[in-house]
């Protein structure tokens, strides 16, 4: 359609007195322009529609129709027109909240397809979610916040992702959509993973491995749970988590099972095994720590140190360093930290350069023994009482 001819038609349409006739005429023009797929005439139409001389009721109605119909256009034209509309109404956003939300949501989808995660997130952030102009459901809020969090995770910005997942959490108790609740749980687990809060991430992933709808998704979540448990700091809490994962029969179907088994059985890990396991890790799980080691290096060193404590009553710094394949001074530092944090039971003699281990068994074994002892004690009491039935009331 010729631009000058279009302007004439728009002027004639705006002069119509009947509201219903005018609305239908604008919709008809919009449909013709969308079918023509020409950008220039569509921009003329949008300019006319968003002009302050056009009644607000008409502008809102036709713009809402535009948000649906323009999705049939090629993606580059959708993006160009979406940005153009937002630019035209930037000073009147309050009057067009619903239309702005629809356009920004569509732009976010387009940017996401281009893997432009940051721009996609920015579009969603700009959607007004706290409004007095319209009713916004908790489901819609949570949906937007979770999507923003997921996009920031793609950019590996866990801090920003956590901000928006926490906002989603505020309204989550009002949401009944199970798919959305699972999306929130998945995103939260990934954030814990990115923040290297591996124990929390492992527990979250394990929970997901039992409630996600598809078997492939459940197995993937279980694999993530195992990886995060392995990467966590060695100690009683991790031992309990490893035990839960090891005893889950599904774990045997996963490639990480062999590594999990050696961890659970407290066997010393070899470099070749560690290297093979490292190939499965994500970039953020291989990031360097302040001491120059990766998270996996730290986890393996601490695990091997705990394993050594089961084999030896005591060991020199030099021998421990040789066993862990690190310098003696570093071995002493790792052991000292673990002893201070009560993740390793023992004492350090710096004069003799010796570590003395106290083999008290793992926490699960201790717990079992305490339960066993309590049961034996109760049996003894019952037997003693049964010897004197006359005293029983």
UniProtKB/Swiss-Prot annotation:
InterPro entries in the cross-refs: PCI_dom, PSMD12-CSN4-like_N, PSMD12/CSN4, WH-like_DNA-bd_sf, WH_DNA-bd_sf
Stretches assigned to the PCI domain: 197-362
Record key words, sorted: Cytoplasm, Nucleus, Signalosome
Transmembrane regions listed in the UniProt entry: none
Cited Pfam families: PCI, PSMD12-CSN4_N
Localisation: Cytoplasm; Nucleus
One term under GO cellular component: COP9 signalosome
Presence of keyword Lyase: no
Entry similarity comment: Belongs to the CSN4 family.
Job description of the protein: Component of the COP9 signalosome complex (CSN), a complex involved in various cellular and developmental processes. The CSN complex is an essential regulator of the ubiquitin (Ubl) conjugation pathway by mediating the deneddylation of the cullin subunits of E3 ligase complexes, leading to modify the Ubl ligase activity.
Assembly, per entry: Component of the CSN complex. The holocomplex is comprised of 8 subunits csn1-8. In the complex, it probably interacts directly with csn1, csn2, csn3, csn4, csn6 and csn8.
Official protein name in the record: COP9 signalosome complex subunit 4
Source organism: Dictyostelium discoideum
């Amino acid at each position: 359609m010729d631009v000058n001819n279009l302007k004439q038609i728009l002027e004639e349409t705006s002069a119509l007195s009947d509201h219903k006739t005018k609305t239908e005429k604008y919709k008809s023009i919009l449909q013709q322009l969308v079918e023509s797929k020409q950008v220039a005439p569509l921009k003329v139409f949008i300019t006319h529609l968003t002009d302050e001389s056009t009644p607000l009721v008409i502008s809102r109605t036709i713009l809402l129709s535009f948000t649906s119909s323009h999705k049939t256009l090629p993606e580059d034209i959708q993006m160009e027109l979406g940005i153009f509309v937002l630019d035209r109404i930037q000073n009147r956003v309050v009057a067009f909240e619903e239309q702005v939300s629809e356009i920004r949501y569509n732009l976010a989808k387009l940017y996401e397809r281009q893997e432009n995660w940051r721009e996609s997130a920015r579009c969603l952030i700009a959607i007004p979610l706290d409004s007095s102009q319209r009713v916004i459901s908790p489901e819609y809020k949570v949906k937007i916040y979770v999507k923003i969090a997921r996009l920031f995770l793609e950019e590996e910005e866990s801090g920003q992702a956590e901000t928006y997942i926490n906002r989603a959490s505020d309204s989550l108790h009002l949401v009944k959509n199970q798919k959305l609740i699972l999306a929130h749980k998945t995103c939260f687990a990934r954030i814990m993973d990115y923040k290297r809060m591996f124990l929390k991430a492992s527990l979250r992933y394990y929970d997901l491995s039992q409630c996600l709808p598809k078997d492939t998704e459940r197995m993937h979540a279980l694999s993530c749970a195992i990886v995060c448990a392995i990467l966590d700091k060695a100690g009683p809490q991790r031992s309990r988590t490893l035990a839960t994962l090891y005893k889950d029969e599904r774990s045997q179907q996963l490639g990480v099972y062999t590594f999990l088994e050696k961890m659970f059985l407290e066997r010393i890990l070899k470099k070749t095994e560690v290297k093979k396991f490292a190939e499965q890790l994500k970039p953020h799980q291989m990031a360097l720590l302040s001491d120059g080691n990766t998270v996996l290096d730290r986890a393996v060193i601490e695990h091997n140190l705990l394993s050594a404590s089961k084999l030896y009553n005591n060991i020199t710094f030099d021998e421990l360093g040789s066993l862990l394949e690190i310098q003696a001074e570093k071995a002493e530092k790792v052991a000292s930290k673990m002893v201070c944090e009560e993740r390793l039971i023992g004492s350090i003699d710096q004069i003799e350069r010796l570590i003395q281990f106290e083999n008290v068994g793992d926490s699960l074994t201790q717990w079992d023994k305490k339960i066993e002892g309590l049961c034996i004690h109760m049996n003894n009491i019952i037997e003693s009482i049964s010897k004197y039935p006359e005293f029983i009331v």
